[in-house]
């Protein structure tokens, strides 16, 4: 998904996580830019995140519980939900929107209305595949609290929920993400620095045979091209080890001595 500021517009791209609300303690790792590798040609925004676009807020609820062998319906739990709020009062100040599907193995509810109407009027949520309906309920509950006239004297809504399969690391049958988890992510959504990696919807994801998860970036266009800020947020859960490249260079040969990749399907992003 991408957001652009300076005349706000919205694009959703499908190339195609006891209740725990505390943020996990994660190892701080260097970003690829901190390692001296620069991706792309345009400069990044201040945060190099989707929240460089004015008004955009992101929130996570991360669920980690249990260890050991899978017990369907119980755990271990490695999942969560991530939400993107395009702007304040988006119901009354809608943003132009569109979609593009590259990999049809991912699903996203609410796209039919976006394609028909050409705008977005509520937050986007990301989560695991089997939790998508419950997460949609959470978005609806939050929206009804914010806008009590929905479905009575105002229009109704179809929540936008994108899913990825985290069943390799998570007890997906347990559908552990609750409506309260979704509301927590929405209520705690903020601008500024975004937690990345194994957080929110990315908690149980894997990519290119390694641990995947949430990533974000931004670019600032030249003034001659409008000076817009373009922000992107992804939930990476795709790719085989041999497909991983950085700046066009295959990475698989450099990982021949590490753990063999455990990838069963193409996945989605």
Sequence positions of predicted segments:
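N-terminal secretory signal peptides that target proteins for export/translocation
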Residues: 1-4
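Bacterial N-terminal signal peptides
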Residues: 6-19
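Alpha/propeptide regions of enzymes that mature by internal proteolysis
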Residues: 23-269
């Amino acid at each position: 998904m991408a957001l652009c500021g300076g005349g706000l517009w919205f694009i959703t791209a499908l190339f195609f996580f006891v209740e725990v609300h505390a943020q996990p303690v994660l190892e701080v790792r260097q970003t690829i830019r901190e390692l001296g590798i620069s991706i792309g040609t345009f400069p990044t925004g201040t945060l190099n995140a989707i929240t460089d676009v004015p008004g955009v807020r992101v929130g996570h609820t991360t669920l980690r519980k249990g260890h050991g062998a899978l017990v369907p319906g119980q755990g271990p739990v490695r999942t969560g939900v991530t939400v993107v709020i395009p702007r304040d009062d988006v119901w009354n100040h809608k943003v132009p929107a569109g979609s593009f599907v590259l990999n049809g193995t991912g699903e996203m509810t609410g796209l039919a209305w976006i394609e028909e109407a050409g705008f977005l009027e509520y937050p986007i949520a990301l989560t695991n595949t089997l939790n998508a309906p419950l997460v949609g309920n959470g978005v609806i509950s939050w929206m009804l609290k914010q806008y009590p006239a929905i479905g009575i004297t105002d229009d109704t809504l179809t929540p936008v929920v994108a899913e990825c399969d985290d069943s390799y690391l998570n007890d997906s049958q347990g559908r552990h993400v609750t409506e309260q988890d979704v509301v927590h992510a929405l209520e705690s959504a903020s601008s500024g620095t975004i937690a990345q990696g194994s957080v929110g919807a990315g908690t149980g994801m894997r990519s290119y045979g390694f641990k995947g998860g949430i990533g974000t970036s931004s670019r600032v266009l030249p003034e001659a091209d409008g000076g817009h800020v373009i922000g992107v947020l992804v939930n990476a859960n795709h790719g085989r080890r041999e497909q991983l490249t950085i700046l066009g260079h295959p990475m698989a040969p450099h990982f021949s001595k590490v753990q063999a990749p455990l990838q069963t399907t193409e996945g989605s992003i």
